[in-house]
């Protein structure tokens, strides 16, 4: 197997390939152009999107040429893959803004200065003539075959709109255009994209005669059954305005023990020998491996300086030491404090809980601390005198810390 593919296989990235042997031979012979696509359905990507872009970084390190494709056009349709119902149709203005923010996020992670492209498929999709598209592209698609793919089979039971049914044709056309414009030979995506990717490979092969390939990656799950990329605060976004760098670091610092080695392979560039060494310990000693994992992935997404700050803040919060200023904080307006404020109200205001009832349950269970002192009274109030040097430390359970600042 080609060296680049061996690296991906060893690290747990490979799931399915349209023709692994031929792809390996091609990659032995030349450096290929490949692409990863992502739709602009949100203002930010989350960590569930990271896997294909980690693969992109690995292949780029081996000299292959990446294309980041932002779906400014396909987002107007909505991909039914992995969805139980039709996606909300977004306004064009919102999609355009999402394209800008997602592009900015990805260019912080992937350096294209030495070769590569970032493109928006709206460039060729927005101006399509529907009749011509059906004549030039639609003739290569079999409805029977499309309905054989899991995405469509599952959705047919609950209702599949015609607009979504068109999505596979558009994604396939993307591959055709990238093959024609940039000599792109490989599309990479999550395994839920298998049907779309295979259809794209077939379209390119049949319409242009070019030999291209598709490669899918496993959908990553956690050993505790929680969905990858979700936390108590919601999605773990890559945008630090939506999800702080500290919380991003803490998400990976607090993964289950059983996931440490797997995530070190997936989310870092550490060598195999080092991963095996640092992940071979058990119990409390495994915390060091979690800290390394959290630092490495935070460095990739947010940069080394921000990773150092997050690491320092975590040590200050849980072990003492410098870095306290980098612990996340909530600014409490004096108008909210007045003479005093109930702790349960403050917890809701600071968004560490979603409701007063949740705050009361946490207090009753002994999981709430003010300046390292456990609070056992649901009616506990805070006044200005509690804010020594203008702040207090609110701790929820063992892992969540927030500075409340006046």
Curated annotation (Swiss-Prot):
Residues annotated for L-tyrosine binding in this entry: 35, 167, 171
Motif range ('HIGH' region): 40-49
Key words, A-Z: Aminoacyl-tRNA synthetase, ATP-binding, Cytoplasm, Ligase, Nucleotide-binding, Protein biosynthesis, RNA-binding
NCBIfam families to which the protein is assigned, alphabetical: tyrS
Every S4 RNA-binding domain range: 341-405
GO terms for cellular component: cytosol
GO biological process, one term: tyrosyl-tRNA aminoacylation
Residue positions binding ATP: 230
Short motif ('KMSKS' region): ranges: 227-231
Higher taxonomy: Bacteria, Pseudomonadati, Spirochaetota, Spirochaetia, Spirochaetales
Main localization of the protein described in the UniProt heading: cytoplasm
Name under which the protein is recorded: Tyrosine--tRNA ligase
Catalysed reactions listed for this entry: tRNA(Tyr) + L-tyrosine + ATP = L-tyrosyl-tRNA(Tyr) + AMP + diphosphate + H(+)
Family note: Belongs to the class-I aminoacyl-tRNA synthetase family. TyrS type 1 subfamily.
CDD domains: S4, TyrRS_core
InterPro entries: aa-tRNA-synth_Ic (IPR002305), Rossmann-like_a/b/a_fold (IPR014729), S4_RNA-bd (IPR002942), S4_RNA-bd_sf (IPR036986), SYY-like_C (IPR054608), Tyr-tRNA-ligase (IPR002307), Tyr-tRNA-ligase_bac-type (IPR024088), Tyr-tRNA-ligase_bac_1 (IPR024107)
Location within or outside the cell: Cytoplasm
Documented EC number(s): 6.1.1.1
């Amino acid at each position: 197997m080609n060296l680049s593919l061996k690296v991906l296989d060893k690290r747990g990235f490979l799931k399915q390939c349209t023709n692994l042997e031929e792809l390996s031979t091609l990659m032995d012979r030349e450096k290929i152009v490949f692409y990863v696509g992502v739709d602009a359905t949100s203002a930010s990507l989350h960590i569930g999107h990271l896997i294909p872009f980690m693969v992109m970084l690995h292949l780029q390190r081996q000299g292959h040429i990446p294309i980041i494709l932002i779906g400014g056009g396909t987002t107007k349709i909505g991909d039914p893959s992995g969805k139980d119902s039709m996606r909300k149709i977004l306004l064009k203005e919102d999609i355009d803004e999402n394209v800008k923010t997602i592009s900015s996020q990805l260019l912080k992670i992937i350096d294209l200065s030495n070769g590569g492209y970032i493109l928006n498929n709206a460039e060729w999709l927005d101006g399509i003539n529907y009749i011509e598209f059906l004549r030039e592209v639609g003739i290569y698609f079999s409805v029977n075959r499309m309905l054989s793919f899991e995405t469509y089979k599952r959705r047919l039971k609950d209702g599949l709109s015609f607009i979504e049914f068109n999505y596979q044709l558009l994604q396939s056309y993307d591959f055709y255009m990238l093959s024609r414009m940039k000599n792109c030979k490989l599309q990479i995506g999550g395994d839920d994209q298998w049907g779309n990717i295979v259809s794209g490979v077939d379209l390119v092969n049949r319409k242009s005669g070019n030999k291209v390939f598709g490669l899918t990656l496993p959908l990553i799950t956690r050993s505790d059954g929680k969905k990858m990329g979700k936390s108590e605060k919601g999605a773990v976004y890559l945008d630090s305005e939506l999800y702080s760098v500290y919380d991003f670091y803490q998400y990976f610092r607090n993964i289950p023990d059983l996931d440490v080695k797997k995530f070190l392979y997936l989310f870092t560039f550490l060598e195999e020998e080092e991963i095996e060494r640092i992940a071979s310990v058990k119990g409390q000693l495994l915390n060091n491996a979690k800290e390394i994992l959290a630092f490495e992935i935070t460095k990739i997404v947010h940069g080394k300086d921000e990773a150092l700050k997050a690491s320092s803040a975590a040590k200050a919060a849980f072990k003492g030491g410098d870095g306290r200023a980098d612990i996340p904080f909530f600014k409490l307006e004096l108008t909210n404090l007045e003479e005093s404020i109930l702790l349960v109200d403050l917890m809701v205001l600071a968004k560490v809980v979603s409701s007063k009832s949740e705050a009361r349950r946490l207090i009753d269970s002994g999981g709430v601390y003010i300046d390292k002192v456990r609070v056992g009274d649901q009616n506990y109030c805070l006044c200005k005198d509690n804010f020594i040097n203008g702040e207090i430390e609110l701790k929820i359970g063992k892992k969540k810390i927030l500075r409340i600042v006046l």
